[in-house]
Amino acid sequence: MENSLKSSGKPLAAPKVGMVSLGCPKALVDSEQIITQLRAEGYEISGTYDGADLVVVNTCGFIDEAVQESLDAIGEALAENGKVIVTGCLGAKKSASGSGLIAEVHPKVLAVTGPHAVGEVMQAVHSHLPKPHDPFVDLVPAAGIKLTPRHYAYLKISEGCNHRCSFCIIPSMRGELVSRPVAEVMLEAENLFKSGVKELLVISQDTSAYGVDVKYRTGFWNGRPLKTRMTELVGALGELAAQYGAWVRLHYVYPYPHVDEIIPMMAQGPLKGHVLPYLDVPFQHAHPEVLKRMKRPANAERVLERVQKWREICPDLTIRSTFIAGFPGETDAQFETLLDFIREAELDRVGCFAYSPVEGASANALDGALPDDVREARRARFMEVAEEVSAARIARKVGKTLKVLIDEVNAEGGIGRTAADAPEIDGVVYVEPAAKASKRYKVGEFVSVKITGADGHDLWGEV
């Protein structure tokens, strides 16, 4: 069989991108990163306007002189080439009317982003100049290689942690908090939704701290500014999920004050049903003295008030948490305080570990280490109380009709999860076979299920 590529006599020419870089060394580094990504994807870099298929102009907007230089450079690129993408500091600058300055002065530009926006620039380049085919790289789907089922995926938004909890050594292994650029996060999320993902699980070591390390720097997504901050990210992910009829679930959410801003998104408006009413909050304990020894925030009363307020705003809210029983120095009274907290907070999903020393953790040096049997007894007692609370809450769902995402199909019908159930760690819904013999459930589809029974952490229902 003949190779069809031979008929052209030569390989297809790679698309060419011109680059104009203005401003400070930080802007120069951004330009280097853009060029590096372009080359990695198979684009060629043109040294002239007329030799380029489009031009990227990296601007400066620090002083008036730099603003004018940047506007002139954009105008020149438009005149000489006609296809221009603008990035850099001037991209974030507003005009006197409040609109984007660049779009007002040069309305023919293809796209505008702010500084440090490699992902956004590449998205714009792809839209106007599709990347060349690479027989090796193109074997990798845009969403990347995933080890989860096709219909759900984890989205890591940061690495590392700034906390110094005495029982934990994660910071020594993973380092300080490093937040991913918001455009990069959004692009990955979009690719995942496009690939068929119906549930996106947002993860990190500390989701609430997203953006702290970059002082909540403003990035760009789809031509609009977007803060590197949890509230804004969740809102943008929710909007994206709504476009694809999908869910966004939040994990590892420390109870910082701005978490309060997320709850209304779950309860009302266009994001309801997409930003799930579900929070995974690692409380770890409830007694202030124990929390102090753990080097954790130590205002349990305030936490309880906030949990109650969250539920007033969003009655369907599911709260998952993890705790440690038998921490060094924990007294009987302090343990009872923990049990009281579980009852009052009515946490839906709870995990508990008997304290165990971790090599390298500062808690190893604390006085008051408890015997193994005491630690295990407290863990078991804790889980008894937690399961009583959980069973009471889950029983309230009987008789309701809930939206269920199907994870598995078998002869007995289907197995899925509600908004209250994260994969692997929470309960499931056993769905009876469809009434019509011709109807079979599909993995990754949503179905409305009337709940007919509850047992432990799981539900039973029928369509």
Swiss-Prot record:
Keywords: 4Fe-4S, Cytoplasm, Iron, Iron-sulfur, Metal-binding, S-adenosyl-L-methionine, Transferase. It is found in: Cytoplasm. Binds 2 [4Fe-4S] clusters. One cluster is coordinated with 3 cysteines and an exchangeable S-adenosyl-L-methionine. [4Fe-4S] cluster 1 binds at residues 24, 60, 89. It catalyses: L-aspartate(89)-[ribosomal protein uS12]-hydrogen + (sulfur carrier)-SH + AH2 + 2 S-adenosyl-L-methionine = 3-methylsulfanyl-L-aspartate(89)-[ribosomal protein uS12]-hydrogen + (sulfur carrier)-H + 5'-deoxyadenosine + L-methionine + A + S-adenosyl-L-homocysteine + 2 H(+). Its EC number is 2.8.4.4. Residues 147-392 form the Radical SAM core domain. GO terms for biological process: tRNA modification. Its cofactor is [4Fe-4S] cluster. [4Fe-4S] cluster 2 binds at residues 161, 165, 168. Residues 395-463 form the TRAM domain. Belongs to the methylthiotransferase family. RimO subfamily. HAMAP family: MTTase_RimO (MF_01865). Catalyzes the methylthiolation of an aspartic acid residue of ribosomal protein uS12. This is Ribosomal protein uS12 methylthiotransferase RimO. The gene is rimO.
